[in-house]
Amino acid sequence: MNNMRAERVGEQMKKEIMDIVNNKVKDPRVGFITITDVDLTNDLSQAKVYLTVLGSEKEVNDTFKALDKAKGFIKSELGSRMRLRIVPELFFEYDESIEYGNKIEKMIQDLHKQDR
């Protein structure tokens, strides 16, 4: 039961964090990001926010620095938007699954080209 609640809260947090980052965080270092998942602990005390960033490695690093700096602001905005007794501690992590999927897709396309 707790696990289902964590999933529901995680989905709502995903939407809210995207809105906060896109509309409220004014740091120019924050690039074009996509939040792919929010993984909450069962007690809702910690949240890993998985995201991808469009851009070079420097832009990715700058975006993560800006998000770490804005973490307190994002957490306070979440607290005002969501009805939670305790707002989870946020940890931003780069989601490598998109890159991995693109790499596999390219390998499959290369195999199809070789077969022709």
UniProtKB/Swiss-Prot annotation:
Full protein name: Ribosome-binding factor A
Organism field: Staphylococcus haemolyticus (strain JCSC1435)
Keyword Cytoplasm (UniProt): yes
PROSITE patterns: RBFA
InterPro entries: KH_dom-like_a/b, RbfA, RbfA_dom_sf, Ribosome-bd_factorA_CS
The protein's assembly and partners: Monomer. Binds 30S ribosomal subunits, but not 50S ribosomal subunits or 70S ribosomes.
Similarity section: Belongs to the RbfA family.
One Gene Ontology term of the molecular function aspect: ribosomal small subunit binding
Entry annotated with the keyword Cytoplasm: yes
GO terms for biological process, alphabetical: maturation of SSU-rRNA
Record's subcellular location: Cytoplasm
CC terms in the record's Gene Ontology section: cytosol
One Pfam match: RBFA
Function: One of several proteins that assist in the late maturation steps of the functional core of the 30S ribosomal subunit. Associates with free 30S ribosomal subunits (but not with 30S subunits that are part of 70S ribosomes or polysomes). Required for efficient processing of 16S rRNA. May interact with the 5'-terminal helix region of 16S rRNA.
Alphabetical UniProt keywords: Cytoplasm, Ribosome biogenesis
